[in-house]
Amino acid sequence: MKTGTKTATANEAASVTAGSGMKWVGRAIRRLEDPALVRGRGRFTADLPATHHVRFVRSPVAAGRLVRISAPDGVRLIRAADLAARPIRPMLHKFNYRPIEQPILAHDVVRFVGEPIAAVFASTAAQAEDAADHVEIEFAELPAVRDTGDALSPDAPTVHELGNTIVDARFTTSEFERTFGAAGRRVRLSVQSHRQNATPLETRAAHAAFDCASGRITLTCTTQMPHLTRTAIADILGFAESDLRVVAPDVGGGFGQKMSLAAEYIVLVFLARRLQDSVAWVEDRRENLIAGFHSRDQRLELEGAFDADGRIVALSADVLANVGAYSCFPTTCGVEPLMAMAELPGPYDLRAYSCRARAIATHTCTMAPYR
């Protein structure tokens, strides 16, 4: 600690208000969450007991038509046809956004490996996992596109009927054409940012409990946006927002992966209402790797224009973002390419800038924000 600074205690930190005259700047504030966590007293979603445990049956193929789903007698199964729910519909009212819908559970077709098709529930997590292994799904496999190059080829299969280009944004400053054309030197560069998974220490998890007295549901889940989660789920399932409470307890890492609405959470709330009981789901590591939201996977074609002293004076960019099969809620699939467009000039005094940024759908896991 630097000489002259003062470390604020928890009580002092709580007393810093707009009218108190105290300021945050120049004060070393102690972390308030550490004592409970280092003593093993954290409160995590997976710690909550439940009557029923859920396991999702996921697609083993990237693209295919669902022909048949069957399960042995005694396996309690929820399919898309059983859900009284609207699809997830993120909206963006600019940048040539094409609205695409994500079903809560896949019906008719699957669009990426790991897409949830059905939900099995049982008395224990182990029983649910065993039961899910006995669910049989027959597919008619379809051609798949795995990257932006495949998706933009003239004869490419379309992930959605609207086409594979979901966002097409363009930005050019007024000085660009003149400055770029007059520059004496140019350098071209191709850059690829590979696909990533946040791999948080705690995977995604949800616990939904029905209160028989009030008819309300409490959803405890590993979300970074409890308020938007409540609004979206109530809207999708068609009941009053006041009938749903969403709690975000201690979360073992979010990094943006837990900032988007998970279809699995909607299934948990639906089941809690139908069973009028408590249900729980904890994602395993394999599920998280294949079906937890991914990030990055961008290709950038850059051309910089320089003056005689080697100073960059103009930049041209073409950004292609592989955004996967669906558009994440609430930020939409435009978040990655549009952030790249906004941040590419970086700290440079660069007033001549032109960029095209596209979000391209493929038969891969959906992209979401990542720090």
Predicted feature residues:
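Alpha-helical support elements that line or immediately flank enzyme active sites
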Residues: 56-83, 117-138, 206-275, 332-343, ...
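Glycine-rich and small/hydrophobic secondary-structure elements
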Residues: 97-127, 257-308, 367-371
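Short coil/turn connectors at secondary-structure junctions
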Residues: 50-53, 73-75, 107, 114-117, ...
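Glycine-rich loop/linker segments at domain edges
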Residues: 33-35, 94-96, 100, 165-206, ...
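Beta-strand segments within the central parallel beta-sheet cores of soluble alpha/beta enzyme folds
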Residues: 80, 243-249, 276-286, 313-318, ...
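Short acidic, glycine/serine/threonine-rich loops at helix termini
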Residues: 87-93, 131-134, 230-232, 255-261, ...
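Flexible, low-hydrophobicity surface segments
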Residues: 2-165
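Acidic, glycine-rich active-site loops and adjacent beta-strand->loop/helix elements
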Residues: 83, 223-226, 250-254, 283-293, ...
